[in-house]
UniProtKB/Swiss-Prot annotation:
Cofactor(s) of this protein: Fe cation
Protein's organism: Burkholderia pseudomallei (strain K96243)
Family recorded in the similarity comment: Belongs to the COQ7 family.
EC numbers on record: 1.14.99.60
Residues holding Fe cation 1: 57, 87, 90, 171
Record flagged with keyword Metal-binding: yes
Amino-acid positions noted as binding Fe cation 2 in the UniProt annotation, renumbered to this chain: 87, 139, 171, 174
InterPro entries reported in the protein's UniProt record: COQ7_proteobact, Ferritin-like, Ferritin-like_SF, Ubq_synth_Coq7
Superkingdom, natural source: Bacteria
Reaction equations catalysed: a 5-methoxy-2-methyl-3-(all-trans-polyprenyl)benzene-1,4-diol + AH2 + O2 = a 3-demethylubiquinol + A + H2O
Protein name in the entry: 3-demethoxyubiquinol 3-hydroxylase
Length: 208
């Protein structure tokens, strides 16, 4: 059973890195009728932002995989699995949008994935309450990060905006689930370290 679980997660990890993700929900579409044409500069900026979002979802897959594998609670395994499936939708949506913008995912995805997997293992080894607290804090920071992207996206890019808005709604739900399941608030130094690491990732992934 454990071996089967490892094989499943290994397959998911490879698909996350390779950009071949399964989509259980369709790509969110804007309410507006026809999207406006983006200028070259707007397309480039939107692509940079969506590449950052795609990297965030690669990291989310690794984090949830590690946390799922390190908990002994069947209920938490299911919670992490459910969140990972929704995050896999985000991964597919952002990859789809990058293709529409004639761009590509980050070249450093294997590095981002490996780093996030290691962090997830450490969080999981610290116990379920700490692991859930880490999940809740991660989702809070992602929510803030997506709020920033919603204000930065070109006004005409309603397609990217629709995707980011649905992603944000899902992240809020995941964070609440972690808190409701018993997640504790992380110490301030840990939260600051997470923000610093996130800043390095986002500033790099925008270009690479």
């Amino acid at each position: 059973m454990v071996f089967d679980e490892l094989i499943t997660e290994f397959d998911r990890g490879l698909r996350s890195i390779a950009g071949v993700s399964r989509m259980s929900r369709p790509v969110p579409k804007p309410a507006a009728a026809a999207p406006a044409e983006l200028s070259a500069a707007e397309r480039k900026h939107a692509a940079g932002l969506m590449r950052v979002n795609h990297v965030g979802e690669v990291c989310a897959q690794a984090l949830y995989q590690a946390q799922k594998l390190t908990t002994s609670s069947a209920g938490l395994k299911e919670m992490f699995e459910h969140a990972a499936r929704e995050e896999e939708d985000h991964l597919a949506w952002t990859a789809h949008r990058l293709k529409d913008l004639d761009s590509r995912p980050s070249l450093l995805n294997p590095l981002w994935y490996a780093g996030a997997l290691a962090i997830g293992v450490v969080a999981g080894r610290l116990g379920d309450k700490m692991s859930l607290g880490f999940m809740a804090e991660t989702e809070r920071q992602v929510e803030s990060h997506l709020d920033g992207h919603l204000s930065e996206l070109p006004a005409a890019d309603v397609e990217s905006r629709a995707i980011v808005e649905q992603m944000r709604a899902d992240e809020v739900k995941h964070g609440k689930s972690a808190t409701d399941a018993g997640g504790i608030e992380l110490p301030m130094p840990a939260r600051m370290l997470m923000r610093a690491a996130s800043k390095v990732m986002t500033s790099t992934a925008y270009y690479l």
